[in-house]
């Protein structure tokens, strides 16, 4: 569990009135602000703070979401031949709907270049 603290009494004067996040599960303390000796975001073992007294602070810890390196998958359940036939005979497939970049679109509303791109991206020999 993470709790925020302001140190009110410490043997080390540099810790006085400093702000920290204490992670009791990991036994770590993250420095938010200190006069000297400790850098912002520096992580130390809680016992390195020595004998301290503190007051707890209200902390709102929002989960962080990493977007970098994510994957995106569109699933279209059909055969390559169906899409190729739709390119050549659009009147036979007026309701053919596919997924493109997270939204549904009628295949016939795409330009010929976009249709070819969909076919190329949808059907590969290997991953």
From Swiss-Prot:
Q: What is the stated purpose of this protein?
A: Acts as a radical domain for damaged PFL and possibly other radical proteins.
Which Pfam families does the UniProt record give?
Gly_radical
| Keywords from the named record | Organic radical
Question: Could you tell me which NCBIfam families the record lists for this protein?
Answer: spare_glycyl
Q: Can you name the source organism?
A: Mannheimia succiniciproducens (strain KCTC 0769BP / MBEL55E)
Q: Does the keyword Ligase apply?
A: no
Q: Which gene encodes it?
A: grcA
Q: Write down the InterPro entries for this protein, in alphabetical order.
A: Auton_GlycylRad_Cofactor, Form_AcTrfase_GR_CS, Gly_radical, Glycyl_radical_cofactor_GrcA
* Coiled-coil zones: none
Q: What is this protein called?
A: Autonomous glycyl radical cofactor
One annotated GO molecular function: formate C-acetyltransferase activity
The record ties this protein, via SUPFAM superfamilies, to: PFL-like glycyl radical enzymes (SSF51998)
């Amino acid at each position: 569990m993470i709790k925020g603290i302001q140190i009110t009494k410490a043997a080390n004067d540099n810790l006085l009135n400093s702000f920290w996040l204490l992670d009791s599960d990991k036994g770590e303390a993250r420095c938010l602000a200190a006069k000297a000796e400790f850098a912002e975001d520096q992580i130390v073992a809680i016992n390195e703070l020595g004998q301290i007294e503190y007051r707890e602070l209200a902390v709102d810890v929002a989960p962080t979401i990493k977007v970098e390196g994510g994957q995106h998958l569109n699933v279209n359940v059909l055969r390559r031949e169906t899409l190729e036939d739709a390119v050549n005979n659009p009147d036979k497939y007026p309701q053919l709907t596919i997924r493109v970049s997270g939204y549904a679109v009628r295949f016939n509303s795409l330009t010929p270049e976009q249709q070819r791109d969909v076919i190329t991206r949808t059907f590969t020999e290997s991953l």
